[in-house]
Regions:
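Short beta-strand/loop motifs in extracellular/secreted proteins, especially
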Residues: 75-77, 105-107, 180
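Accessory carbohydrate-binding/adhesion or oligomerization-edge regions at the termini
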Residues: 1-61, 68, 84-90, 98, ...
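Tight coil/turn sites that cap or link beta-strands
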Residues: 74, 161-164
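Short strand-turn-strand beta-turns centered on an Asx-Gly dipeptide
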Residues: 94, 105-116
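Surface-exposed beta-strand/loop patches in extracellular or lumenal glycoproteins
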Residues: 77-82, 96-98
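Extended extracellular/luminal ectodomain segments enriched in beta-structured repeat modules
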Residues: 60-62, 70-80
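Intrinsically disordered, low-complexity Ser/Thr- and acidic-rich flexible linkers and loops
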Residues: 88-99, 133-138
Length: 189
């Protein structure tokens, strides 16, 4: 994939504000070695815990992913954006984002230093969070909805300036039910 990222973390809660402020100021946080990676999907830790950039990390930590995009003109770019999706066998997932939110885990996005709220509102906003397996429970019989899968939602519009545009994504790890990572795939609309 052509998306190149610099990832910082994982960081426990007591350092999150410090690291966030440094990154927003364009500084490298003390004591953190950046990880260079590429792709539209960055896996920090899978539900199985055996894969990802930080497979041994426990809930309560946060990671940041940063990239830049060039735009020849000021305008709107679109991207497929997501942070978790239900396990098809058990439904374990952080759920559909509430209005204005990127996830039910406290995900935040800045474009050129300005925080951006999710402009999309979903009919299932704030629902379908399953922290435990749904086997033998009524939730297991609920049909999946496209809103539960970030790749089936419409692309998200982002306002960009002419030239280099910096995207910073903060992704907390809130529980082992979560497939912890970042998906950000620019698309043409």
């Amino acid at each position: 994939s052509f998306v190149e990222w610099t990832v910082f973390g994982p960081v426990p809660q007591d350092r999150q504000e410090e690291v966030r402020n440094n990154l927003l100021a364009g500084k490298s946080p003390a004591g953190l070695s950046p990880v260079q990676t590429r792709g539209g999907n960055l896996y920090f830790r899978t539900r199985a815990g055996a894969e990802g950039l930080f497979p041994k990390t426990k809930p309560g930590n946060t990671a940041w992913a940063e990239t830049t995009f060039h735009s020849p003109v000021e305008g709107t770019m679109h991207a497929m954006v997501g942070f978790d999706a239900p396990a098809r066998s058990t439904r374990r997932c952080s759920g559909v984002p509430a209005a204005g939110e990127w996830s039910q885990c406290g995900t935040r996005i800045w474009v050129n230093g300005k925080e951006m709220k999710n402009p999309q509102t979903y009919k299932l906003a704030g629902q379908r969070r399953y922290e435990k397996h749904t086997w033998n429970s009524p939730a297991n019989e609920i049909p999946f909805d496209n809103e539960e899968f970030w790749w089936a939602r419409p692309p998200v519009p982002f306002q960009v300036k002419a030239g280099e545009n910096r995207i910073l994504i903060e992704q907390p790890y809130t529980g082992e039910f979560q497939s912890w990572g970042v998906s950000f795939i620019p698309v043409k609309k």
